[in-house]
Every structure is written in structure tokens, then in C-alpha cells.
């Protein structure tokens, strides 16, 4: 079992149909969608969410962007069950069944179906990198670069450091708590992630400030040179 799993069912008990709820969803989904909407509201193609957790975000965003096909994923079986429960509850035709994707595997892939359009329009990652080893950040960016179409986007939401420093005392305290729980966890620096993206052909294109001292990092797939 991958060691960076956070078990949402321990925070809020599951609903009778198996749906789990994460406390952060109610606080952040509107703000995250506001950041994503200019890119995704009217887009077409396929969007993969990695580390979907409870499945609440992907269900909500699939409702708001019906022209896209949304593909949730996670590594933890109870989360996969919750994602499927949210999918069934939503009744959305553009929300696919969850896939098991382990970002600790550097060669992870998205499994297409006969209706998929090929390369991904976007990859979405919400609140994962600070509760995961550094290799997960490496794997996320390298895998997104492999599987995004030209001009496709990787969106990464969460708390980050900038220029080697925390952006708020609350983030510094949170980082210390995470590292005390697991030395491989902690807030990642934007510059380090930007370097990964540059090396992978997925340069950092935008940094979007968000409420509660969070950011959305937008990486854009470079045009392939033939």
C-alpha cells in the first residue's frame, strides 16, 4: 500500500451508499473551479484527476463542464469505492468509473476506452503533493507530460513554498506538522516543481493565488518539435 494515503473515512463517516466526504471540498471547490473554468468550461476531450480522494471534486467539475469526459483515479480501495458511489449518485454520463493509479509508479498510465479522444486535455491534482514523497511530484509531472496533448494543461492545487520560504505562518506550521508525521511529506517549493516541468517539456505557465494561502500551478504542454 502506498504510504501517502489519507483515509477520508476516518474524518467523516461514510454515507449509507458508500460516499465519503472530505471537509476541504466545501471550502475550496468553488475557488478551484473559478481557476479552472477559463480553460475547461467550454473545452472538449478528456480530463484525468489523479488522487481523487472522495470523488467530490471530480463529480462537481464534471457537472460544470459537461463537454469534457472526466476520469477519476486513486490508489486506495475505499476511495475508489467512494468515487464510484459519487459517480452513481451524480448520474453524469461524462463521468467515468475510477481507475487505480499509483503515482509512486513512475510509469503510471491512464487507461483509455474506445470513446476517448487520445491524449488528455488536462490533468488535475488537488491536495496531493504535500502528503506524498517527492518522487510523487516527479511522477505526476513526468506522467502528465507524456499523456497530455499539445497545449494541454496540468493543474496542481495546494499549499506551496515560494523562493524557499513559506507564504504564511499557518503554512509553516502545517508543514512542520506534516513532516513530524512523515519526514517524506511537506510543502513543495514552486521553483522545484517548475524545474521538473521544464525538464519534462511541461513548463510552468501560471501561478494563481487561491484562498487560505493556497495556489493553483498551471503547467502547459509544450509544442512537440518534429
PLM-predicted stretches and their roles:
Residues 48, 60-108:
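Class I SAM-dependent methyltransferase SAM/SAH-binding core
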Residues 2-42:
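Class I SAM-dependent methyltransferase Rossmann-like catalytic core
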Residues 167-191:
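Conserved Class I S-adenosyl-L-methionine
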Residues 151-160:
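Conserved beta-strand signature within the Rossmann-like core of class I S-adenosyl-L-methionine
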Amino acid at each position: 500500500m502506498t504510504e501517502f494515503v489519507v483515509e477520508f473515512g476516518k474524518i467523516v463517516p461514510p454515507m449509507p451508499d458508500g460516499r465519503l466526504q472530505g471537509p476541504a471540498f466545501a471550502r475550496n471547490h468553488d475557488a478551484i473551479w473559478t481557476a479552472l473554468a477559463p480553460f475547461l468550461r467550454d473545452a472538449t476531450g478528456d480530463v484525468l484527476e489523479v488522487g481523487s480522494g472522495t470523488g467530490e471534486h471530480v463529480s462537481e467539475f464534471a457537472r460544470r463542464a459537461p463537454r469534457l469526459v472526466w476520469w477519476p483515479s486513486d490508489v486506495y480501495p475505499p476511495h475508489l469505492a467512494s468515487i464510484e458511489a459519487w459517480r452513481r449518485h451524480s448520474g453524469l454520463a461524462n463521468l467515468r468509473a475510477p481507475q487505480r493509479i499509483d503515482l509512486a509508479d513512475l510509469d503510471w498510465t491512464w487507461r483509455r476506452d474506445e470513446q476517448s479522444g487520445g491524449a488528455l486535455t488536462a490533468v488535475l491534482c488537488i491536495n496531493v503533493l504535500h502528503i506524498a514523497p517527492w518522487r510523487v511530484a516527479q511522477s505526476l509531472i513526468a506522467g502528465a507530460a507524456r499523456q497530455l496533448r499539445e497545449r494541454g494543461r496540468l493543474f496542481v492545487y495546494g499549499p506551496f513554498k515560494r523562493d524557499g520560504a513559506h507564504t504564511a505562518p499557518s503554512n509553516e506550521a502545517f508543514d512542520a506538522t506534516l513532516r513530524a508525521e512523515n519526514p517524506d511529506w511537506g510543502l513543495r517549493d514552486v521553483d522545484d516543481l517548475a524545474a521538473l516541468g521544464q525538464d519534462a517539456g511541461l513548463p510552468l505557465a501560471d501561478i494563481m493565488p487561491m484562498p487560505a494561502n493556497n495556489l493553483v500551478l498551471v503547467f502547459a504542454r509544450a509544442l512537440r518539435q518534429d
